[in-house]
Amino acid sequence: MLGSLVSKRTAPAPRLLLQLLRSPSLRSHESATGQSVTTGGRGEPQWLRAAVGGRHGTSPALLTGGGAATGGRQRGRTETPCLAAATWGRLPSPEDTLPGQDSWNGVLSRAGLGVWALATALVVHCYSKSPSSKDAALMEAARANNVQEVSRLLSEGADVNARHRLGWTALMVAAINRNDSVVQVLLAAGADPNLGDDFSSVYKTAKDQGIHSLEVLVTREDDFNNRLNNRASFKGCTALHYAVLADDYRTVKELLDGGANPLQRNEMGHTPLDYAREGEVMKLLRTSETKYQEKQRKREAEERRRFPLEQRLKEHIIGQESAIATVGAAIRRKENGWYDEEHPLVFLFLGSSGIGKTELAKQTAKYMHKDAKKGFIRLDMSEFQERHEVAKFIGSPPGYIGHEEGGQLTKKLKQCPNAVVLFDEVDKAHPDVLTIMLQLFDEGRLTDGKGKTIDCKDAIFIMTSNVASDEIAQHALQLRQEALEMSRNRIAENLGDVQISDKITISKNFKENVIRPILKAHFRRDEFLGRINEIVYFLPFCHSELIQLVNKELNFWAKRAKQRHNITLLWDREVADVLVEGYNVHYGARSIKHEVERRVVNQLAAAYEQDLLPGGCTLRITVEDSDKQLLRSPELSSSQAERRPPKLRLEIIDKDSKTHKLDIQAPLHPEKVCHTL
């Protein structure tokens, strides 16, 4: 791997072309032709003088008298095609074949030398090493191992973590050039040793930034290092990666002592140890990795004690305390080594739609993998309802279309074998898919269509299903009603210490006599259900949780109104009580979201369209005065409340705290709209 990053250059370096510009053969050819490219009366262009050192008399005239390099004369000067291309920003690529040149690695012939040399000189001038800022000067001093200059620039306010315009930092420059003294000074000044390089490869960087690849190549070699393979990708490499590539023990030691992470991976997924040669550097890295892992385990354990998983999950999920506690306990066993390492952890989430099953899986993955996208794999099992679609799961066998692409699951598990895998709506999958999942849950490994085995015993598999959701919802509502009645009876008996609780627990009798027969009838095999570590039940929301859902949704729209329209949105407490009535137990939190959109957002959109909302105003959502009594009088019949539900209105709050109702014109009724043919 090291050989792929360190260049073994056999072809002439781009800087060698500048030496060719000074060659006697080129001068003698110029004398024979009597032609030169000049500007002004000094016989040489200013940009060419800068390219070869900035001194008069050092730049030779360019060959322009023959072949394809010859251009038209305009006002006493010769303009070659390459110069014209440079003027329009279209320099030829080094890999392109030029007149008189067989390839980039070949030797330029006399006929094409003037064209390519002119292009090179233009590039070098554009990227000449004359720092225009303290940050650029800091990187130049770091490359030159000038410790005094580095200290002076830092004292004058140079940013120690500033990036070169192509992506690297001064610490990376010092590390790759084996300047351990500069590394020590930069670390003491607060340089971050774990920053990754934004530079990928010469050609990709040139494409991304819209500049010529030769410009990037010369800049990389001049400002960074000329021993690296310019076709390899260095994106994400830290200063420690570069120090290991340079095989400099002292620099590696300085970086590790300064807090560099020996386990940090670059974009290719490689740690610094992957690039180490046999010797002292490799031994040092192995020892450091072991120590760093031990420190990391202690730090994470302390963090888990201070901020338990259940508390983190509750920040993102409303309600479902029993489900959160079940998942948190299982994850805690796994994190602390109290689990079976031969089998993966398997959950089955049961409950109605829109009740938090998928969100709990996402937050679990976020906790386990620190926001890494590869750490969460989601498969919609409704895409695997037919038998022939099983091939998409693990990959097509040899000879079939899609064999080389691999399966949706196996391909992602190869990238992250310890991922959190969500099988959404598993009840819709074909039975053959369940057979594959049975092997996956039992042995913790999977064989793809190419015959390769993926070991995923460290993964977490979560299945969601709407099977038995109606039974679970009705049972939970019944338990909640019974608990409410019991609390009211005890309050009526003057037991002042009684508190009404919304917490309920699904009984074991209900799980065994109601839920398990339904699951067995659907999945048709006890061995599949037996591989599930925990069956987690998601219950309908209680009233207090619905109020939280309403406030969360209103806060979302208040933030959107402030960001997009500079409108401050407020609401009364009674508004949440009105919107809660839109809850549907079968649709969960989505029914609250839709109710807010219908009754609040529709009015906001209509008022904005009718130009009733001035910029920077303050809006308040309130309940009509005539309907507030309806909310305060529970004795009103349900039929009366059904005929006339409470109405919400929008009010603008003036600077003097006075309010006035917005007169929003209702759109025409669909039946009154006349369509003209």
From Swiss-Prot:
Residues 92-126 are annotated as: Autoinhibitory. Residues 477-505 are annotated as: Regulatory. The record marks C126, Y127 as: Cleavage. Its EC number is 3.6.1.-. Proteolytically cleaved by protease PARL. ATP-dependent protein disaggregase activity is stimulated by PARL-mediated cleavage of the N-terminal autoinhibitory peptide. One of its GO terms (biological process) is cellular response to heat. It is an enzyme of class 3 (hydrolase). ANK repeats lie at residues 133-162, 166-195, 235-265, 268-297. It is found in: Mitochondrion intermembrane space. Pfam families: AAA_2, Ank_2, ClpB_D2-small. The modification N6-acetyllysine is found at K559. Disaggregase activity is inhibited by ADP. Signal peptide: none annotated. GO terms for cellular component: cytoplasm; mitochondrial intermembrane space; mitochondrion. It comes from the Eukaryota. GO terms for molecular function: ATP binding; ATP hydrolysis activity. It catalyses: ATP + H2O = ADP + phosphate + H(+). Its main location: mitochondrion. Residues 1-28 form a transit peptide. ATP binds at H316, I318, S353, G354, I355, G356, K357, T358, E425, N466, R531, R590. Functions as a regulatory ATPase and participates in secretion/protein trafficking process. Has ATP-dependent protein disaggregase activity and is required to maintain the solubility of key mitochondrial proteins. Involved in mitochondrial-mediated antiviral innate immunity, activates RIG-I-mediated signal transduction and production of IFNB1 and pro-inflammatory cytokine IL6. Plays a role in granulocyte differentiation. Homododecamer when substrate-bound; the homododecamer consists of 2 homohexamers stacked head-to-head via ANK repeat-mediated interactions. The active substrate-bound form is likely to exist in a dynamic equilibrium between homohexamers and homododecamers. Homotetradecamer in the unbound state which is remodeled upon substrate binding into the homododecamer. Interacts with PHB and PHB2. Interacts with MAVS; the interaction is enhanced by Sendai virus infection. The ankyrin-repeat region is necessary for ATP-dependent protein disaggregase activity. It plays an important role in stabilizing the substrate-bound homododecamer by mediating contacts between the two homohexamers. Belongs to the ClpA/ClpB family. This is Mitochondrial disaggregase.
